[in-house]
Amino acid sequence: MLSIVLVRPQMAQNIGMVARVMLNFNISNLIIVNPKKNDFFDIANATSCEALTQLNLTVVQNNDINIALKEALQDIHNVFALTTRSRDLTKASFYINDMNEHIQETQNNAFLFGCERTGLTNNELSLANYIISINSNPNFPSLNLAQAVGVCSYEYSKLKYLQEVNKNTKFENTNNLDRTKSLAIATVKENQYFLDDLFTRLSEKGFFKDSTKKEKNQHNIKEIFQKASLTSK
């Protein structure tokens, strides 16, 4: 299952155009985190030709964007964050059309999009499992929000179709399933619970002696475990 997650969207019209293109590709779960205006629905729905009313819409609000985003993603297994800018992050990064080996229809997946003006912050990106980008003109790479959602939705629907074809036509050797396919991938909420507990235990043992490096060290540890694709068990 796929969810589209919009973080701090600025314009109701953009939300509406996103809803319309989602319905074009039969994607029904839209999560909006801290929209700029709470009264976006009527304008967005009109812009979407009433597609918004046909989606499963969730709006998450909190004065702390990190808390709001963690709540929005708590049941997601794989978070794919879209950005056009190079970042100083150690996460796996690839073009949207190369995501086939990283996404499974049996898991909860999400495409994460930042606000129209500034995109995703590094703190918001830290909750993602993967960084993805669209192979566009390097001299003019930024698509508008609905265009970006449209490209990602198309690639996902194409991948979903190909996976279905392969499932029906290709014999699968169940004796050789790898660990990440035979066990459920941990959700964002489960990962966060594990990391919070780990950091508490490390602090109690005096691991973070240099307080000036604590945040950086925690970030590096978090990146290591996110790359490991932890399972629920």
Question: How would you describe each model-predicted region?
Answer:
Residues 1-233:
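Post-transcriptional modification and biogenesis factors for structured RNAs
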